[in-house]
Structure formats: structure tokens, C-alpha cells
């Protein structure tokens, strides 16, 4: 992975630090990208690297993820992450020049980006990959139940590994990760683990904090859905295959489908940017060219 052309450490309200990295073409349209719960922005390199020749790509991790130091669990919640987002945008503009920002978010960061936009209109458009806003998969279980299940899984997850290779091998045995190329599973392990005290490796995002985010998710996603008509910028949602068992389904209301400019990738799961980076990059460019770069 290439070194960023610039890095700015953003000091947010409670003393936490967010490392924002700049890649790509500084003269191009500006993309601001973040990641899903428990993951890291560097993990999405197979996707955003395809946009780097044309776009000014600014990436950042959520607090307690990726490049950022761990924070106390009590400060780890969606309202605080929304405030972090706002501070990140302010720093990007002040350090690297003021120009329109196009948000590119996945999973939990889509909810944060949408909540950010409702509070303050910092984005000129939002490209959203597989946010869960109403029902999961075919609707056989509610979003609330799914969030609770994900929280339980996070708390039960193995937390210590001898090496990143051990985690990468375990990922290869899990069906949800089987659609990723082996090198992407390896990248996932490298970007989500850090050396542990006493040897071995542990997750950069503590499992308890990941679980807590899932528990916050439901309430905020419902709030976003109820305010869908408040958005006055172009929106694009690309979901996983609705039959995959974990996919964005905005509702059965055709007006909601139209508002989100909804599309999906057949045969892909929640991790579609990691499974089909080329298709996701093409859809990103197509959306921006159609709505804001024409």
C-alpha cells in the first residue's frame, strides 16, 4: 500500500485523535471515505486505489479503529462519531483547501455520514455501500434483532492471535468472508490487528466497543429513515444481494427506493467493496458523473 501524500492528526472534542490520510490526485474532486464497524479505511485499498488517479482521496478511521488510538468505551457512541466526522471535514478543508466533499461510506459509517449531513450540510453527495436502514436480507428478522446478534458475536469473538496469518486463515473458513480474495482477507487481518502486550496480536477496535456500536445502530438507523425527505443532496445506495442474508433493503416503499437511487450487486455480500472493488469503483464514478461532476 502506498504511503499517503499527507497526514493530519485531528484533535476532536474529548481529546481523541483521528488520523486523516490523503492519497490520489490533489487537484481532483474530493472523496472522503471511511469504513464499517471493526474494520479500517486501509482495508478498502482494493476499491479506493482504483479512484486515486482521478480523485483527491481522503480516508480516515473511526476512533479506536485503524491508525487511531483506543479511547474509553464510554466515549464510543454514534453521536460522538458524528462530531468526529464534522471535525474531520473541517480539518480537511483547512489543511488541504476548501472544495466540495463527496462522502463514500460503508455499513456503520453510512449512518454516521447521514446523521452528520442532517446536522450540518458538509457533503455535496453521499455514496453509501450497504447501510442497514430497515430490514435485513429477506426481512426474516428485524434490524433490531440483527444488531443484537452482531453485538453478541462481537463479544464472543476470539480476541487474541499468534499472528495476522492465524486470523486470515480463520476468515477463510467463514462463509461470509469466502467471497473475498485471499489477499484481501490477509489485508483485513493486517489492518484490524495490532501487537498485544505480552506478545501476539489483538483487535485494534476492542470487541466490547464494536458490540456497543451495534447496539447504538438500530435507533440511529430508524431516525435516519424517518428523515429521508430532509436530504437535498444526491444519494446513491449500492446494496449487497438481497438474498445474501445480510443486505440493505430500504423499504418496500418505491419512493424510498427512488430517493436512495438504490442498486445492488448480485451474488455479493455486505462486504461488496472488498469482494467486487472494480464494480463498486465503476458505480461510484458513474454516480458522481451523473449527478455532480457533469
Task: For every predicted segment, state its role.
Residues 1-34, 54-56, 93-97, 261, ...:
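Alpha/beta-hydrolase fold catalytic core
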Residues 13, 62-104, 282:
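Active-site loop/oxyanion-hole signature of alpha/beta-hydrolase fold enzymes
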Residues 98-141:
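Conserved hydrolase catalytic core segment
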Residues 126-164:
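Flexible "cap/lid" loop of the alpha/beta hydrolase fold
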Amino acid at each position: 500500500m502506498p504511503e499517503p501524500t499527507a497526514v493530519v492528526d485531528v484533535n476532536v472534542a474529548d481529546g481523541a485523535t483521528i488520523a486523516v490520510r490523503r492519497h490520489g490526485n490533489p487537484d481532483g474532486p474530493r472523496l472522503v471515505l471511511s469504513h464499517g464497524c471493526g474494520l479500517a479505511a486501509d482495508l478498502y485499498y482494493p476499491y479506493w486505489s482504483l479512484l486515486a488517479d482521478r480523485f483527491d482521496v481522503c480516508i480516515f478511521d473511526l476512533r479506536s479503529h485503524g491508525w487511531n488510538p483506543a479511547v474509553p468505551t464510554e466515549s464510543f457512541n454514534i453521536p460522538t462519531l458524528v462530531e468526529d466526522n464534522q471535525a474531520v471535514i473541517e480539518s480537511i478543508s483547512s489543511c488541504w483547501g476548501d472544495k466540495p466533499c463527496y462522502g463514500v461510506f460503508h455499513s456503520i459509517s453510512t449512518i454516521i455520514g447521514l446523521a452528520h449531513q442532517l446536522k450540518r450540510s458538509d457533503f455535496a453527495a453521499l455514496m453509501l455501500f450497504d447501510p442497514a436502514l430497515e430490514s435485513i436480507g429477506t426481512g426474516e428478522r428485524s434490524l433490531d434483532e440483527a444488531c443484537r446478534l452482531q453485538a453478541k458475536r462481537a463479544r464472543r469473538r476470539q480476541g487474541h492471535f499468534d499472528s495476522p496469518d492465524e486470523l486470515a486463515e480463520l476468515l477463510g473458513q467463514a462463509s461470509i468472508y469466502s467471497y473475498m480474495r485471499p489477499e484481501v482477507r490477509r489485508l483485513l487481518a493486517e489492518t484490524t490487528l495490532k501487537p498485544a502486550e505480552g506478545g501476539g496480536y489483538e483487535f485494534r477496535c476492542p470487541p466490547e466497543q464494536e458490540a456497543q456500536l451495534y447496539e447504538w445502530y438500530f435507533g440511529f438507523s430508524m431516525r435516519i429513515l424517518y428523515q429521508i425527505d430532509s436530504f437535498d443532496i444526491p444519494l446513491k445506495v449500492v446494496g449487497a444481494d438481497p438474498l445474501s442474508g445480510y443486505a440493505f433493503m430500504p423499504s418496500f416503499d418505491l419512493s424510498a427506493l427512488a430517493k436512495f437511487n438504490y442498486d445492488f450487486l448480485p451474488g455479493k455480500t455486505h462486504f461488496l467493496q472488498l469482494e467486487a472493488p472494480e464494480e463498486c469503483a465503476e458505480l461510484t464514478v458513474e454516480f458522481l458523473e451523473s449527478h455532480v461532476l457533469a
